[in-house]
């Protein structure tokens, strides 16, 4: 247990630690936990193997104590040095009778007690007697004095930790509002993306149309150039033919002159 305590401290000052979890660390007694933990408000010792509470330190600010699934059968008087205790879980231990629970009368602020899976719960009128013994108690084994079940584990923790249920409700409303805002923002962004895609598609079509027009103009220019070239070639051929014709006529006239001479 001592090594586990040092590990959980994580170099923090002892008098500044408010919560300590020593579950499953395996020890039959309290070892290494001292009166120096004056700020401790929550202590968990679930399934440690404790057979006695002898040596339990004086913890003036302790409000929540988890001792379930151990082998404790007596010695609850060692807990009375923590007068602010509001939540005590002793389920799964070896408590056999109500007399063993008498020391709990010292806890004037105790509102939640769990004794489930202890032989003491088999005593006749057990619940009625416990509520009478502990007037401040609101819940015993998960039910109130009218056998109404606790709403949730979080409700007990909120009450022990001093959290107001109204504040929790406000927080829930804020969360819902945030979710709505996120959904609205999500819709806007999707719409913007959709519009952007449409604009890009239109731009692509316009680009293709312009490219098509440019191609047509280029084809027209090429056709015009080909036509001009053909006309020039035809003109040259015509001139060549005229030249040949004139040359032939000149030769004929030359021969005629020679003949006449």
Swiss-Prot record:
Composition bias, Basic and acidic residues: 238-252
Protein origin, superkingdom: Eukaryota
Keyword Repeat attached: yes
Keyword hit for Nucleus: yes
Acidic residues bias (residue ranges): 145-185, 194-229
GO molecular function: histone binding
SUPFAM superfamilies per the UniProt record, alphabetical: L domain-like
Gene Ontology biological process terms from the UniProt entry: nucleocytoplasmic transport
Domain LRRCT: 118-156
This protein's GO CC annotations: cytoplasm; endoplasmic reticulum; nucleoplasm; nucleus; perinuclear region of cytoplasm
Major site of localization recorded for this protein: nucleus
Repeat region (LRR), residues: 16-37, 39-60, 61-83, 84-105
Keyword vocabulary terms for this entry: Cytoplasm, Leucine-rich repeat, Nucleus, Phosphoprotein, Repeat
Role description: Implicated in a number of cellular processes, including proliferation, differentiation, caspase-dependent and caspase-independent apoptosis, suppression of transformation (tumor suppressor), inhibition of protein phosphatase 2A, regulation of mRNA trafficking and stability, and inhibition of acetyltransferases as part of the INHAT (inhibitor of histone acetyltransferases) complex.
Cross-referenced PANTHER family: ACIDIC LEUCINE-RICH NUCLEAR PHOSPHOPROTEIN 32, ACIDIC LEUCINE-RICH NUCLEAR PHOSPHOPROTEIN 32 FAMILY MEMBER A
UniProt protein name: Acidic leucine-rich nuclear phosphoprotein 32 family member A
Organism name: Drosophila melanogaster (Fruit fly)
